[in-house]
Design a protein with these regions (language model features):
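Long, low-complexity, Lys/Arg-enriched
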Residues: 1-320
Length: 320
């Protein structure tokens, strides 16, 4: 959401804002104590079709210390992860919950120091993200309020949500605001999005990506101060990213200039805001020419370049 932050700071900054670092992997780690099933869904279930051995999965997740424990549940590190043994891997997570929590202790400490410094004395924090299930927001809400015991109201502004009951509950109580679509507003757009989600979500992610490296997780430096562990350099064209960001900034500049000239605030309705994006999403050939060599891996964790999924591969597989 780097470009959204740039637009806000340049043209709309009425409330103090900072570009807070977060990642799906880190948020999953930080909420592991409460959400082990969520950890399993993102880290293990999504790797079932990846032709990895159990040992390779645990190594990729930096949980090598659990490899000797596979024998306890009748598994071997050289077995391929599959739908049949995945439930036993979930058992492994629950059985060694405390050991895993201990391995994340430094990360929790670093994240707590980082977020306390960023949030400071603020009493209401709104995390801005794309979507789609609000899981990163929910994980950070748990971490900040339950683990860090911070007295802060937390909400999230998303582009769209995908109609899950727990997301609807957070919309009902005002914790999540979904601008373009949800099960409660513009549900027809949500249904179209959900049908095309595997490809469309990746296009959204590319449009709103940045040229800086992505955060993997937090750590402490030698002085005990919060630091960051970054993902390896992802495959993507920095010139295309710069051009997309400049186009977004140019539009925001022209739009706010018109508002000032007319002396009115021109609020863009959700459907109108979505219309050009909706058209772009349907231009598969155009998107393929632009983004075919963009890495779009949707598996959390430090995935090797050899296993990285490219946009062209997703399109060729029909988004599966």
């Amino acid at each position: 959401m780097d470009v959204v932050y740039k637009v806000y700071q340049r043209f709309f900054a009425q409330v103090d804002a900072v570009y807070v670092k977060a990642s799906r992997t880190s948020s999953i780690h930080l909420s592991f104590e409460r959400h082990i099933d969520h950890f399993f869904d993102w880290h293990i279930r999504r790797r079932i079709s990846s032709a990895l051995t159990l040992g390779e999965v645990l190594h990729e997740l930096e949980l090598d210390f659990l490899i000797p424990d596979l024998q306890e549940i009748g598994l071997h590190e050289d077995e391929l992860l599959c739908a049949d043994n995945a439930p036993q891997m979930k058992e492994l997570l629950y059985a060694h919950r405390e050991k895993i929590l201990d391995s994340y202790a430094q990360e929790r400490c670093a994240a707590q120091k980082y977020y306390r410094a960023q949030i400071a004395e603020a009493k209401h924090v709104c995390f801005v993200d794309l979507g789609w299930k609000g899981s990163t927001f929910s994980s950070l809400e748990y971490f900040l309020k339950e683990t860090c015991q911070m007295d802060v109201q937390i909400s999230s502004a998303l582009l769209g949500t995908e109609g899950h009951a727990f997301v609807d509950e957070k919309i009902d109580c005002g914790k999540i605001d979904s601008y373009i679509f949800s099960s409660q507003a513009n549900a027809d757009i949500m249904r179209i999005h959900n049908r095309n989600g595997n490809i469309w979500r990746r296009i959204y992610e590319i449009i709103f990506t940045a040229n800086e490296r992505s955060l993997l997780r937090f750590c402490l430096d030698e002085q005990g101060e919060p630091d960051f562990v970054w993902l390896r350099d992802e495959v993507r064209d920095p010139h295309i990213i710069d051009a997309m960001q400049q186009g977004i900034l140019d539009f925001a500049h022209d739009y706010t200039q018109i508002e000032r000239r007319l002396g009115v605030d021109l609020v863009i309705a959700a459907r109108d805001a979505y219309r050009p994006l909706f058209r772009i999403l349907h231009e598969t050939d155009y998107n393929l020419r632009l983004f075919q060599e963009f890495e779009v891996c949707f598996i959390a964790g430090n995935v090797s370049r050899q296993r990285a999924e490219m946009f062209k591969d997703v399109v060729m597989k029909g988004g599966k």
